[in-house]
């Protein structure tokens, strides 16, 4: 049978004298197509959950998060007892923390900002470290009090005591006198070569660079080094930090090093001399840097390893790695 409404041949059993209007609930003038038979007879979609139902789900998740944190605390309590008999030294584990933060960023998805997730985990790590072995954060405020406080609170929270200092050497000296404290000092600029105090054996060392997850709009973007004492087995050595003292330091030698490494340079007491803090990645070496200095007309007076840290994990502003 030929349908005037659709211009197609329809099976006889689909039409009756009243079809398609009566049989399929169509209004006169409404076009008819076989596909409409399915759409008109399909079930309505299920109603969305109510606000109350969603709030119950959220409350349940919040309770689970709290329960898991308490369970983590129970494990830390057992860990403390084990460490009292099996381990000596600081509770900081820079290599483990770096691995944990990388995995956190890689698996993160959804609308929750990465900033929030990163800060929550940093505070969890710092607080449980503090519970294991109480420590204080000694911060050099000479680079800007507000930015340094933001960095300290973002990465260590409010449970860990915060102690202000007004030059980096004072912060490092306080850590040297302590049992397990740490210092935060600028990673990009300084007026004094504070890292010289890290050269001797047994002194504190650079153990981390923050923020570890680096992006342009980071809420605690001030680059800082973390200085403390940790077990050699706990260190991460992806980037080595070297204290290098040179003579013949000038703009030409600085330009010669810029493609090879990040450098903080401070003039020292020697004529045309400088104390350098050099970041040596796996893509280069101290020998290459020394050769570049010599080729540029400088001479190396001494060098000493003063710490190491993880390679920074860079993401875009929207959180993509």
Language-model regions, residue ranges each:
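Domain-level signature for soluble enzymes in the chorismate/prephenate branch of the shikimate pathway
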Residues: 2-4, 14-16, 21-321
């Amino acid at each position: 049978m030929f349908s005037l409404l659709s211009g197609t041949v329809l099976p006889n059993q689909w039409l009756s004298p009243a079809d398609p209007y009566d049989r399929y609930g169509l209004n006169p003038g409404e076009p008819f197509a076989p596909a409409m038979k399915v759409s008109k007879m399909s079930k309505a979609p299920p109603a969305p959950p109510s606000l109350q139902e969603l709030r119950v789900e959220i409350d349940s998740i919040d309770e689970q998060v709290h329960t898991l944190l308490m369970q983590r605390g129970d494990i830390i309590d057992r860990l403390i007892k084990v460490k009292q008999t099996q381990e000596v030294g600081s509770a900081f584990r820079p290599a483990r923390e770096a691995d944990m933060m990388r995995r956190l960023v890689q698996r993160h998805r959804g609308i929750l900002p990465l900033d929030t997730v990163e800060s929550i985990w940093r505070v969890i790590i710092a607080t449980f470290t503090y519970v294991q072995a109480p420590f204080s954060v000694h911060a050099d405020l000479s680079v800007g009090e507000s930015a340094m406080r933001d960095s300290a609170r973002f990465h260590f929270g409010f449970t860990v005591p915060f102690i202000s200092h007004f030059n980096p050497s004072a912060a490092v000296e306080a850590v040297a006198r302590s049992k397990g404290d740490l210092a935060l000092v600028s990673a990009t600029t300084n007026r004094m070569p504070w890292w010289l105090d890290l050269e001797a054996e047994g002194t504190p060392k650079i153990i981390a660079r923050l923020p570890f997850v680096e992006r342009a709009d980071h809420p605690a973007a001030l680059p800082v080094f973390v200085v403390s004492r940790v077990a050699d087995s706990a260190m991460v050595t992806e980037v080595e930090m070297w204290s290098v003292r040179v003579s013949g330091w000038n703009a030409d030698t600085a330009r010669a090093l810029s493609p090879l490494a990040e450098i903080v340079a401070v003039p020292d007491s020697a004529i045309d001399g400088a104390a350098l803090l050099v970041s040596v990645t796996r893509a280069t070496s101290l020998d290459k840097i020394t050769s570049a200095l010599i080729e540029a007309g400088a001479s190396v007076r001494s060098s000493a390893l003063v710490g190491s840290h993880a390679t920074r994990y860079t993401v875009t502003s929207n959180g993509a790695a």
